[in-house]
């Protein structure tokens, strides 16, 4: 039993299997479809939290601009879905049929050249994965090669998220502006609004999330993961050993961007829209909170942290519409101050030892030999014997 308890610890196969059981069996059987769809949306954010565990927890680099890569992945998928929904027959009432409605409203008469690759689904998938990763490579290479890290890197990533938000809002004729891209209903002719489609998208999201955890766990157990930890704690020693610290950090940043882009694309499929409100500074900071609450050193904990924070956000906003922001802040501060290592640290430092002690006591009580039955008491007979006569 002790092995099972340790087996279910953070970043272990047991923790991954337990999470898989919760996501694949427990939640679909216990939640109605609307709530399950919300969980699927929350799991899209969990991809960003996984990337932050690798970048921040293992690499020691805090990024406050992960919403940029989440938004690029989401907008890439939204562009393909919007073009599919803007076929000439559906948009025949427009001045220029065959282009998105917001382009027609802004008197654009032809599809821009940089939109054309998103008419192909395979090319769209390739761009969703490569464009955010390439942007992360450019930013990371420029910063880490100049040994920019710490709070300076965090501020720069915040600035990038602000720039992208302003760019999206300002180019209303090409991006939909502040309203974003809406009415994204079909994927390759498949209606994503039906109950069966939502259920399928949920399980696809779960499958990709579990695969991402396996990938990140493999990286953590490899020499690369060891080097990331060493660079976080003793950067100069790793550099003096002959390793290029900058390129390893660039890799971690690119991996985090890749995972965030996957989450953004799945988010667009789940909810049917994409807007600049999911790209800016505030959502980027919220994504850091997901990893901090779950535990920035735990992949599985990051998923639980994402679910907990978003579930609390949903409950508080429904029950206390005027106070939910303060309650969310109080929850975050309470968790961070009481448990600096997040939910995963709470499990390993408090819950796991408690379970081990309980199992040990149960074993001791079962292994203790039973006391032999006491002999019956000797009762003196009142009948006189022959020796008394």
Question: Where in the sequence are the language-model features?
Answer:
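Transmembrane alpha-helices and adjacent helix-loop boundaries
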Residues: 1-389
């Amino acid at each position: 039993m002790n092995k099972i308890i340790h087996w279910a610890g953070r970043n272990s196969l047991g923790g991954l299997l337990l999470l898989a059981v919760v996501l694949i069996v427990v939640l679909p059987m216990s939640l109605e479809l609307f709530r399950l769809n919300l969980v699927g949306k929350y799991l899209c954010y969990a991809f960003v939290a996984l990337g932050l565990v690798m970048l921040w927890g293992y690499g020691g680099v805090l990024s406050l601009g992960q919403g940029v890569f989440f938004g690029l992945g989401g907008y890439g998928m939204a562009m393909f879905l919007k073009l599919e929904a803007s076929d000439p027959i559906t948009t025949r009432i427009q001045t220029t049929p065959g282009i998105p409605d917001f382009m027609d409203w802004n008197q654009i008469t032809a599809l821009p050249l940089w939109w054309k690759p998103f008419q192909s689904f395979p090319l769209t998938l390739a761009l969703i994965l490569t464009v955010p990763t390439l942007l992360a490579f450019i930013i990371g290479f420029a910063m880490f090669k100049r040994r920019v890290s710490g709070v300076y890197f965090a501020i720069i990533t915040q600035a990038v998220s602000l720039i992208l938000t302003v760019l999206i809002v300002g180019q209303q004729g090409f991006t939909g502006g502040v309203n974003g891209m809406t009415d994204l209903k079909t994927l390759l002719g498949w209606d994503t609004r039906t109950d069966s489609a939502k259920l399928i998208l949920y399980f696809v999201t779960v499958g990709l999330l579990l695969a991402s955890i396996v990938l990140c766990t493999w990286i953590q157990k490899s020499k690369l993961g060891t080097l990331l930890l060493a660079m976080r704690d003793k950067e100069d020693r790793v550099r003096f050993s002959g390793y290029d610290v900058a390129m390893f950090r660039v890799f971690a940043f690119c991996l985090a961007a890749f995972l965030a882009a996957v989450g953004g694309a799945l988010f667009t499929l789940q909810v049917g829209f994409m807007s600049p409100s999911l790209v800016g500074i505030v959502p980027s900071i919220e994504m850091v909170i997901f990893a901090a609450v779950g535990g920035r050193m735990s992949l599985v904990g990051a998923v639980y942290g994402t679910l907990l924070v978003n579930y609390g956000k949903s409950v508080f906003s429904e029950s206390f519409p005027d106070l939910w922001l303060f309650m969310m802040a109080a929850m975050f501060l309470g968790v961070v101050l009481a448990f600096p290592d997040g939910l995963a640290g709470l499990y390993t430092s408090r819950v796991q030892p408690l379970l081990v002690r309980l199992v040990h006591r149960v074993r001791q009580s079962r292994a203790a030999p039973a006391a032999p039955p006491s002999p019956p008491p000797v009762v003196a007979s009142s009948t006189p014997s022959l020796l008394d006569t």
